[in-house]
Structures are given as C-alpha cells and as structure tokens.
Amino acid sequence: MRTLWIVAVCLIGVEGNLYQFGEMINQKTGNFGLLSYVYYGCYCGWGGKGKPQDATDRCCFVHDCCYGRVKGCDPKTATYSYSFENGDIVCGGDDPCLRAVCECDRVAAICFRENMNTYDKKYMLYSIFDCKEESDQC
C-alpha cells in the first residue's frame, strides 16, 4: 500500500505525457523515470525555481524551458508519436506541436543519460524551499 501511495504522489508532479516521457527515460538510462527523476533538485517535477543543483537538474531546467517554447498544444498532456530505432528515440507524426513536445522529451532523456554520473540521491525529493538562488534564464 505504501508503494502505491509513493507512485501516486509521483504521478501528480510530473510534466508531459507521463508514460511516454517515462519510457524514453527508461530506454536511455535504464532507470525507472518516475521514481528516479520526479522531485529531483529544483527543476525535475512540476515547475521549478532557483539554480539547478547539478547537471541532472539542469536537464530538467532545459526541459522546462523547451516546454515553455512549445506553441499550439499543451506539452503537459500532449500524446505524440515516437519509436525506438537502434537505441535512438525517433519522434514522428505530422503535427508540429506534438513533434516539438516529443523533441523536448527526447533531448531530456538523452541529457539524463549523458549526465548519469552527476545524479546524487541527496537531491531526490528535494525541497523547493531549498531552491533560493536566483533562477537562470531560459
């Protein structure tokens, strides 16, 4: 029952199409995306403020900025077309907005993979109240 509660809490705070973004993260890192990256640092999860705490948190900051540039659909709920081909994530479909959201998620998943060595468990479930420094600009 406790595990179910933890997963439910995690589901509330993740931006984007949860399943699709989580699958991309799993594919690129081998980690379960929801539990590994939700509420990590100052930017992973819902919203964000302050300075990214490390390169992993910066991936989330860049992802938030990318979502902020998407026009024509809601990146938080958009369902897009994508596939995995030879270890790569390939965004598809004809809708430019959905492709843009997919690209944001793809780039973030790759960023997590490239920065796995910076992942620090002390930033899991990090309090937003500890994110006091001035925010970087997108």
Curated annotation (Swiss-Prot):
Q: Which reaction does it catalyse?
A: a 1,2-diacyl-sn-glycero-3-phosphocholine + H2O = a 1-acyl-sn-glycero-3-phosphocholine + a fatty acid + H(+)
This entry's comment on the bound cofactor is: Binds 1 Ca(2+) ion.
Q: Which CDD domains match?
A: PLA2c
**Record EC number:** 3.1.1.4
> Which tissues is this chain's protein expressed in?
Expressed by the venom gland.
Alphabetized PROSITE patterns for the sequence: PA2_ASP, PA2_HIS
**Which residues pair up as cystines?**
C42-C131, C44-C60, C59-C111, C65-C138, C66-C104, C73-C97, C91-C102
Any one Gene Ontology biological process term?
arachidonate secretion
Which family does the record assign?
Belongs to the phospholipase A2 family. Group II subfamily. D49 sub-subfamily.
UniProt-recorded name of the protein: Acidic phospholipase A2 DsM-a2/DsM-a2'
Q: Which organism is it from?
A: Daboia siamensis (Eastern Russel's viper)
